[in-house]
Amino acid sequence: MAAVVVELRSTGQPGRLSPHSSWRLPVSSTLHSRYLSLMQLKGCGTALVTPFRQDNSIDETALRNLVAWQIESGIDFLIPCGTTGETPTLSHDEWLYVIDVTIEVAAGRVPIVAGATSNSTHDAVEKAKEVAARPGVSAILTASPYYNKPTQEGQYRHFRAIAEAVDKPLILYNVPGRTGANLEPATLARLAEVPNIAGVKEASGNMTQIAEVCNAVPEQFLVFSGDDAVTLPVIALGGVGIISVASNEIPREMAEMTRAALNNDWDTARKLHRKYLPLMQANFIESNPLPVKAVLAMMGRIEEVYRLPLLPMRRDTRSKLQKIAIEVGLIARPAGASAEANDFYIYESWLAGPHKIVLHRSNCGQCNHGKGRPAGHDANHARWHGPYTTLSDARATAQQMTGVLIRSECKCI
């Protein structure tokens, strides 16, 4: 009889289990797709970024430091080589290298859920086999096939083929905004009965669908939110936690929020959610992982380097992101900026005469409460841009604007 390895070992840390290969569960057991819950894989897991150096090579030192910081901050499990890790830009060897470094640094202190996805079922199976062979991998995260848009039956057969090929549990990843293929609740309910398929990361962005998923799958099936902003409602519906982007930046806070919700301490959970919701939302002001890597660079934890086709953030969105990072206490206010006059705005007008723009400070007395709206503002003939955290950002943006005949700065500057 085939056996599925369930890796368990006490780490001395409450709520955490780590790899061990001494306990085996027959595939035919009624617990076949439920045993991951025995590992207490719940709470907040970080979908790790992959740090790069300026020469585009993997920054192993930054990766090691990031993994260590995550664990020291109380994160419950780690996911290397997912969407946030820019995995499509990694070579095959680099993909395994990132997973191996994460396993080595974690040293059994938290479970490792390794990403292994392909739009070819054959390749997805081979990748899953490679990571399943690593003793430090507790489970595999695998997304719906992207680009080729399989039917529901095609997705079912794809995931079942992977599950039947490996002896590690699978967490399925439904992210139709990326893959172009939505994994519907009825299909997921069928997959929940397949040996080795133990849970799902639900990132459909559709709360009605997530509610249907929670109702359709068995109680022991693990449902994770794939979106930080809806962690609490997903847990309220029966979910077991979050596979998080924001925990790259705020691991302790995301772990505390998630544990509070799981322990029915909703006052604490809501308090943390209210404070960090702007950051959770700002992490998607441009394509993930651009904002989260930008914030980590602002924090001094990584270099802000992406691989093509990804490019650094635009100045306007970076400025908004920086402002939020300051407000939630992740980074210090820029030198020389005061709390009363931290932001700058560009006011663009074409009501009369030449098209023109004027730079204003946020506390300018000539503007409407410093929002770049001088008296007599006409929304049909004017608009404002910003805020910009630094004057240099505002000036650079103004310089790049086209079709503007006159540029000037208010006396408040």
Where are these regions (language model features)?
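Short helix-capping segments at alpha-helix termini
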Residues: E104-V110, R134-G136, V166-K168, E193-N196, ...
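Catalytic alpha/beta core domains of metabolic enzymes, predominantly
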Residues: E164-A165, R178-F284
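Short, low-complexity intrinsically disordered segments enriched in A/P/G/S/L with frequent Arg
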Residues: L8, L17-P19, P26-S29, S33
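Active-site beta->alpha loop and helix N-cap motifs at the rims of alpha/beta catalytic domains
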Residues: Y35-T46, P51-G180
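C-terminal alpha-helical cap/extension of soluble enzyme domains
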Residues: L36, Q40, G45-P51, S73-I75, ...
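Ala/Thr-enriched low-complexity intrinsically disordered regions
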Residues: A2-A3, T11, T30
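Residues at the N-termini of beta-strands
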Residues: F77, A139, G199, G241, ...
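Mature, structured domains enriched in cysteine- and short glycine motifs
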Residues: A335-I413
